[in-house]
Curated annotation (Swiss-Prot):
It comes from the Eukaryota. Serine/threonine-protein kinase that converts transient diacylglycerol (DAG) signals into prolonged physiological effects downstream of PKC, and is involved in the regulation of MAPK8/JNK1 and Ras signaling, Golgi membrane integrity and trafficking, cell survival through NF-kappa-B activation, cell migration, cell differentiation by mediating HDAC7 nuclear export, cell proliferation via MAPK1/3 (ERK1/2) signaling, and plays a role in cardiac hypertrophy, VEGFA-induced angiogenesis, genotoxic-induced apoptosis and flagellin-stimulated inflammatory response. The modification Phosphotyrosine is found at Y93, Y438, Y469, Y508, Y755. PANTHER family: PROTEIN KINASE C, MU, SERINE_THREONINE-PROTEIN KINASE D1. It is an enzyme of class 2 (transferase). This is Serine/threonine-protein kinase D1. Disulfide bonds: none annotated. GO terms for molecular function: ATP binding; diacylglycerol-dependent serine/threonine kinase activity; heat shock protein binding; identical protein binding; kinase activity; phosphatidylinositol 3-kinase activator activity; protein kinase activity; protein kinase C binding.
Length: 918
């Protein structure tokens, strides 16, 4: 241990700032003894001295209060602050009045002199901090948590009750000090036992390593009595503002915080006798972790043990290791504060986790559902670049000021409701090697280095270069068959092994050596690509590439494919059903082009082999569902077969095998959610939203006319036909759709919770107005970039609170007509909710510019299905009255097509739809 520093007065000419720097330099290794200023030579504005806590010494600066005096209480608070940061496991929380201060006086016989008033402290003194004998052991055990709302990107569990934290974002609370996670409902029950491991600093590292000197002032004690009164000041530099002065609290200064249970309750509980737990076998209805080893309690029932008194949960194997610290049933104001109090209670509507069962399917894709879209939407605040950086700062949610002007609703994101699927790397080489072939146009057998990936077969000149002879796209391969006798084989030449047929040429691949001159050594495959073994491996590899999504373990026959014998093709266009048609002979599926995934399958990109037309192919694995749900798998196909509308995605055909269903649809550009999230502000302007919503409503009107309710309407299921700023949109994904009559109700579980009406969430009967609620949510998320409801509150209560639903940011920029339409769509009572035609007639959608944009779209696609001829004269008259320009080509179109039989037929059909819906 080094000798204590020599205390000596500095030179009288030493400036005040230099004296502070010299005092700070005393803690730097190798800087020699610490020079102290002469007593009474206080720098302007405060007294500079050192605080000694055990073996740690810190320079501090005591500032004057507004009355010009010094306060001893501020010195005690400063000492507690140093202990909290350097020794968080021994925090002095609330012990300001139990700290004694002693001044080192080498000239006195008793070196330590008790400091009774602040004036006893002189410039350059060394003050020893001693804990009074009146401090009890319980005082050291009480360390409150710093709880802040946190968004988790992976499933997490409450460290108090052990149950999973449910929800999409802001699922629970995280302590800044110890990093533990809790339910919001558990906040009042959490014991004040924070360990502070996340913000712990090595006790042998001085806080002055940051180049700062601690200061204390009485100016802030009234506003924040429990905060450390610290203001870092760099020697020789200007002092920072008080708002930047709280080290260790810089990150969450503006975030919504929660407080734990009262400290008086902890003192009361510490006086209770701790006894062994009384464990009994328990069955849990929700995912729960062992509160001893923090691992999941696995199983369907009787997963673990629970204490009858305090509800502590653990594994059977962990029970002997649990300490005897049961406090029994602890209640305050009639409420049970034990850890697992709600572990076997079914939650009611309006509680924090009332979506737990409904959202269970969402947890499989929590990492995918909250990727960069969510990070960008949440990053609205700024993190202070303070010295004590949180090691988990990249996973903290950004600072969000809680005020009436800011929306705290869930940010808009892509909600995935399927089993997690990872996207394969594009252009992955599936097989490569030397191979020989000749064609129907050239009988000369050639040898190339073949490389097979997910989209093509490339014939390279050699195995290292990039120059290639030919590329055979897999989408152009019409047939893969074993070798047949051919007249093209030269006399005396060896026959080929298999054939690849395209529209223009047939490739005869491989060479079957009938009479080999010498067998290859050790039965190894010849490197030249000759022989039946190497050809057989290539045939199997190409067959798998042509049908990349066949079930694992299925055999691929070289002759008659096993799928061809049992597959069925249903053509939607002409209602023809063909037996023994394999989808791989008609379409090429690209396994690395995943367009999306839904409740019942994955959607891949594909191509028609003969025409080269791009398609989207949804592949449904029937083995994932019970037999009784197979009818639901075909529900989408059955509905789309009867739908032919420009606003609904076109279904081409369907293939079915015992294991899978292949639904082939037209391929579009993207979806509406991608358009919203990629926009400049993360939300759409009103004129674009009107344009898209009108098209959605027209498609819905056609569905409702046929008594079809979509039941899962959301931006992900609204596809864009092009990348234009004003694109055509089409509805897709009818897996949840239902046939519901005009006055009928259904009760089956449907849809995505974030877009579902309250009657579905409450398991009540619903009708076609369910889709209109979803339209209201789509309008809301399009204009604001957030979901309209917070998961913590009852939907009905939130709707009644206009300040909550429509905070000034961003709703002050949005018209009152849009808000009025949203209010009429988000009606909890179904009979008050707007219908399709009433929504289309709303003033917000009856907009001249929107009508012009829709007419231009109809002119581009060559079909009029959104607007009606009867409105032409009205809008033309409106343009004349308002002095607006009416496009001349629209006048000519209405004059030329107004009297045609086709126009009359379309008009009568549209009129009948409106009358039927009304």
């Amino acid at each position: 241990m080094s000798a204590p520093p020599l205390l000596r007065p500095p030179s009288p000419l030493l400036p005040a700032a230099a004296a502070v720097a010299a005092a700070a330099a005393a803690l730097v290794p190798g800087s020699g003894p610490a020079p102290f200023p002469a007593p009474g030579a206080a720098p302007a504005g405060g007294i500079s001295f050192h605080l000694q806590i055990g073996l740690s010494r810190e320079p501090v600066l005591l500032l004057q209060d507004s009355s010009g005096d010094y306060s001893l209480a501020h010195v005690r608070e400063m000492a507690c602050s140093i202990v909290d940061q350097k020794f968080p496991e021994c925090g002095f929380y609330g012990l300001y009045d139990k700290i004694l201060l002693f001044r080192h006086d080498p000239a006195s016989e008793n070196i330590l002199q008790l400091v009774k008033i602040a004036s006893d402290i002189q410039e350059g003194d060394l003050i020893e901090v001693v804990l009074s004998a009146s401090a009890t052991f319980e005082d050291f055990q009480i360390r409150p948590h710093a709880l802040f709302v946190h968004s988790y990107r992976a499933p997490a569990f409450c460290d108090h009750c052990g149950e999973m934290l449910w929800g999409l974002v802001r699922q629970g609370l995280k302590c800044e000090g110890c990093g533990l996670n809790y339910h919001k409902r558990c906040a009042f029950k959490i014991p004040n036992n924070c360990s502070g491991v996340r913000r712990r600093r090595l006790s042998n590292v001085s806080l002055t390593g940051l180049g700062t000197v601690r200061t204390a002032s009485a100016e802030f004690s009234t506003s924040a009595p429990d905060e450390p009164l610290l203001s870092p000041v760099s020697p020789g530099f200007e002092q920072k503002s008080p708002s930047e002065s709280f080290i260790g609290r810089e990150k969450r200064s503006n975030s919504q915080s929660y407080v734990g249970r009262p400290i008086q309750l902890d003192k009361l509980l510490m006086s209770k006798v701790k006894v062994p737990h009384t464990f009994v076998i328990h069955s849990y209805t929700r995912p729960t972790v062992c509160q001893f080893c923090k691992k999941l309690l696995k199983g369907l029932f009787r997963q673990g043990l629970q204490c009858k008194d305090c509800r502590f949960n653990c594994h059977k194997r962990c029970a002997p290791k649990v300490p005897n610290n049961c406090l029994g049933e602890v209640t305050i104001n009639g409420e049970l504060l034990s850890p697992g109090a709600e572990s076997d209670v079914v939650m009611e509507e309006g509680s924090d986790d009332n979506d737990s069962e409904r959202n269970s399917g969402l947890m499989d894709d929590m990492d995918e559902a909250m990727v960069q879209d969510t990070e960008m939407a949440l990053a609205e605040g700024q993190s202070d670049g303070a010295e004590m950086q949180d090691p988990d700062a990249d996973q903290e949610d950004s600072n969000r000021t809680i005020s009436p002007s800011t929306s705290n609703n869930i940010p808009l994101m892509r909600v995935v409701q399927s089993v997690k699927h990872t996207k394969r790397r594009s252009s992955t080489v599936m097989k490569e090697g030397w191979m020989v072939h000749y064609t129907s146009k050239d009988t000369l057998r050639k040898r190339h280095y073949w490389r097979l990936d997910s989209k093509s077969i490339t014939l390279f000149q050699n195995d290292t270069g990039s120059r290639y002879y030919k590329e055979i796209p897999l989408s152009e391969i019409l047939c893969l068959e074993p070798a047949k006798p051919s007249a093209l084989i030269p006399t005396g030449a060896n026959p080929h092994c298999f054939e690849i047929t395209t529209a223009n040429v047939v490739y005869y691949v491989g060479e079957n050596v009938v009479n080999p001159s010498s067998p290859p050594p050790n039965n190894s495959v010849p490197p030249s690509g000759i022989g039946t073994d190497v050809a057989r491996m290539w045939e199997v590899a190409i067959q798998h590439a042509l049908m990349p999504v066949i079930p694992k373990g299925s055999s691929v026959g070289s002759g008659t494919n096993s799928h061809k014998d049992i597959s069925v093709s249903i053509s939607v266009s002409n209602s023809q059903i063909q037996e023994n048609v394999d989808i791989s002979t008609v379409y090429q599926i690209f396994p690395d082009e995943v367009l999306g995934s839904g409740q019942f399958g994955i959607v891949y990109g594909g191509k028609h082999r003969k025409t080269g037309r791009d398609v989207a192919i949804k592949i449904i694995d029937k083995l994932r569902f019970p037999t009784k749900q197979e009818s639901q798998l075909r529900n989408e196909v059955a509905i789309l077969q009867n739908l032919h509308h420009p606003g609904v995605v076109n279904l081409e055909c369907m293939f079915e095998t015992p294991e899978r269903v292949f639904v082939v649809m037209e391929k579009l550009h993207g979806d509406m959610l991608e358009m919203i999230l990629s926009s400049e502000k993360g939300r759409l302007p009103e004129h674009i939203t009107k344009f898209l919503i009108t098209q959605i409503l027209v498609a819905l009107r056609h569905l409702h006319f046929k008594n079809i309710v979509h039941c899962d309407l959301k931006p992900e299921n609204v596809l864009l036909a092009s990348a234009d700023p004003f694109p055509q949109v089409k509805l897709c994904d009818f897996g949840f759709a239902r046939i519901i009559g005009e006055k009928s109700f259904r009760r089956s579980v449907v849809g995505t919770p974030a877009y579902l009406a309250p009657e579905v969430l409450r398991n009540k009967g619903y009708n076609r107005s369910l889709d209109m609620w979803s339209v209201g949510v789509i309008i809301y998320v399009s204009l604001s970039g957030t979901f309209p409801f917070n998961e913590d509150e009852d939907i009905h209560d939130q709707i009644q609170n206009a300040a909550f639903m429509y905070p000034p940011n961003p709703w002050k920029e949005i018209s009152h007509e849009a808000i009025d339409l949203i209010n009429n769509l988000l009606q909890v009572k179904m009979r008050k909710r707007y219908s399709v035609d009433k929504t289309l007639s709303h003033p917000w959608l009856q907009d001249y510019q929107t009508w012009l944009d829709l007419r231009e779209l109809e002119c581009r696609i060559g079909e009029r299905y959104i607007t009606h001829e009867s409105d032409d004269s009205r809008w033309e008259q409106y343009a004349g009255e308002q002095g607006l320009q009416y496009p001349a080509h629209l006048i000519n179109l209405s004059a030329s097509h107004g009297d045609s039989p086709e126009a009359e037929e379309r008009e009568m059909k549209a009129l009948s739809e409106r009358v039927s819906i009304l």
